[in-house]
C-alpha cells in the first residue's frame, strides 16, 4: 500500500512525517557516507599512502601522494613560480591533487546534506528527540563511511 503524509508512521526517534521526509533522511545519510569516505581517502593519501598504493598499484603518485601532489598547483611544480593556472591555488585547487579533491567532496556532500532539510515546508517542527535522532544517525553515517574507507578497505 502506498503511504502518504496522512497515514505515514510517525517514527518516535526520527520524526518521519511522510515518504518525502524519509527520502530526505536517506539522502542525507548517503551524502554523509560519501563525505566520510572522502575524508578517509584524504587521510589515506596524506598519512598512509603506501596502503593506497598497495591496493591500487597504478595510482599516479604525482596526483595521489599528498607528500608530492601539493606541488601540482604550482607552475613546474615549484611554489616560487606561482600558480600553475588561474585558480590552481584557490578556487580550482580540487583539480590539482587527490587530497584537495577528497576534501572538496567531503565538504560539499556534508554541506549539501545540511541544507537539504531547510527547504521542504513541514506542518510542525521537529522536537529535540527527533533532532537528536537525526543528528546521531547522520553523524553515524559519516563515521561509518570514514571507518569503511580508512580502516576496513586498507587493513592495518
Q: What are these language model-derived features?
A:
Residues 3-156:
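Cationic, hydrophobic amphipathic alpha-helical membrane-interacting segments
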Amino acid at each position: 500500500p502506498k503511504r502518504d503524509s496522512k497515514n505515514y508512521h510517525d517514527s518516535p526517534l526520527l520524526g518521519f512525517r511522510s515518504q518525502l521526509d524519509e527520502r530526505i533522511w536517506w539522502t542525507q545519510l548517503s551524502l554523509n557516507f560519501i563525505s566520510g569516505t572522502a575524508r578517509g581517502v584524504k587521510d589515506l593519501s596524506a598519512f598512509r599512502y603506501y596502503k593506497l598504493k598497495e591496493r591500487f598499484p597504478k595510482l599516479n603518485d604525482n596526483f595521489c601522494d599528498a607528500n608530492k601532489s601539493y606541488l601540482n598547483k604550482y607552475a613546474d611544480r615549484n611554489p616560487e613560480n606561482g600558480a600553475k593556472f588561474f585558480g590552481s591555488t584557490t578556487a580550482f585547487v580540487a583539480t590539482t591533487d587527490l587530497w584537495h579533491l577528497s576534501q572538496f567532496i567531503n565538504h560539499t556532500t556534508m554541506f549539501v546534506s545540511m541544507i537539504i532539510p531547510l527547504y521542504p515546508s513541514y506542518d510542525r517542527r521537529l522536537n529535540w528527540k527527533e533532532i537528536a535522532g537525526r543528528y546521531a544517525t547522520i553523524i553515524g553515517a559519516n563515521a561509518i563511511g570514514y571507518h569503511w574507507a580508512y580502516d576496513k578497505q586498507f587493513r592495518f
